[in-house]
Swiss-Prot record:
InterPro entries: Complex_I_Subunit_2. This is NADH-ubiquinone oxidoreductase chain 2. Its EC number is 7.1.1.2. The chain crosses the membrane at residues 12-32, 34-54, 74-94, 99-119. The gene is ND2. It comes from the Eukaryota. It comes from Artemia salina (Brine shrimp).
Amino acid sequence: MIEESKENSLKYFLIQSVASVIFLASILNQSFSFLIPFALLIKIGAAPFHMWLVSISKSMSWKVLSLLMTFQKIGPLLGLAMLSSVSHLSWLMVNMSSFLLMLVYYVTYLAILYFAVILLQQTPMYSLAQMNSNAS
């Protein structure tokens, strides 16, 4: 268990470091500025760059995972909000009209995620197949 925790910590560190290097390199070199959103999406763990989050979250406790899924996303989400355009997620465009609306959205996201984590922590399910068998 400790070895797996060390491995996941190293994976997280390396992926976040690579994303930070891509982000900084794309800021310094204007010809690669199109890579800024990609670096931020890697840091958030958004699709199609989400596979690192899935592999790391397998062995995490729910408390640590909830921190990873909430507070670690604040910086990159704000960075994406500053780059927002019609092609980005629609809720990011809300930030252009009202910071309060974005704050309400994020607090709602935190509350939903918190209750989902609490529910999943108290239920001994480890796959979607178990969820389906418990429903019948």
